[in-house]
A protein has these predicted regions:
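Short beta-strand edge/turn micro-motifs at domain boundaries
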Residues: 127-154
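Hydrophobic/aromatic beta-strand elements that line small-molecule binding cavities or substrate pockets
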Residues: 81, 95-100, 113-115, 129-135
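Solvent-exposed loop/turn segments at secondary-structure junctions
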Residues: 59-60, 67-69, 114-116, 149-153
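A short hydrophobic beta-strand element
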Residues: 105-115
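Short, low-complexity N-terminal intrinsically disordered segments enriched in polar/charged residues
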Residues: 15-58, 154-156
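Bacterial N-terminal signal peptides that target proteins for export
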Residues: 1-12
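A solvent-exposed, acidic/Ser-Thr-rich amphipathic alpha-helical stretch
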Residues: 30-36, 49-105, 124-125
């Protein structure tokens, strides 16, 4: 009678560890993209264009919520945020649902967020939808394309 070969427990444990890395490797890029998006929101809340700009790649394109003009260079993107922070004082962003898809060194985060700001002493809200396209640069996910538009009103 033949007995089946025994797998040493250390080898089995090693296999389990390697398998767990494989599954977390699939989750980690999505978490990193979500963190990059959250960092953008925190930078927006700071009201300083110089904190927002480094989150965009050098060749980024921005279709901002407040402008009909596409911004396709760093100076134009900076000008957009200088203007936005003046028009919407105390600007903050709160995220709703997000759908993150990762394709190697590129990723897309699509969802909605609500901007809040203070006007005439009263807090106002501006719901909007967005798409961020990211490219991985070293260990950082940088925005290469950003589209944001006000949420359309519902028709009844």
């Amino acid at each position: 009678m033949r007995s089946s070969p025994r797998v040493p427990s250390a080898a089995l444990a090693l296999c389990m560890v390697l398998l767990s890395f494989g599954s977390s490797a699939l989750v980690e890029p999505k978490a990193d993209v979500a963190a990059a998006t959250l960092a953008w929101g925190q930078a927006i809340g700071g009201g300083d264009p110089e904190k927002v700009l480094p989150l965009y790649s050098d060749d980024a394109v921005l279709w901002g919520t407040l402008s009909p003009t596409v911004r396709s260079d760093r100076a134009a993107i900076r000008d957009y945020f200088v203007s936005a922070f003046k028009v919407l004082p105390g600007l903050k962003v709160t995220y709703g649902d997000q759908l993150i898809r990762v394709y190697g060194n590129a990723a897309v985060n699509t969802g909605y967020y609500t901007f809040s700001y203070v006007k005439d002493g009263e807090t106002k809200n501006l719901p909007a939808r967005y798409s961020f396209t990211y490219v991985k640069n070293g260990e950082r996910w940088l925005i290469v394309d950003h589209h944001s538009s006000a949420m359309p009103s519902t028709h009844r």
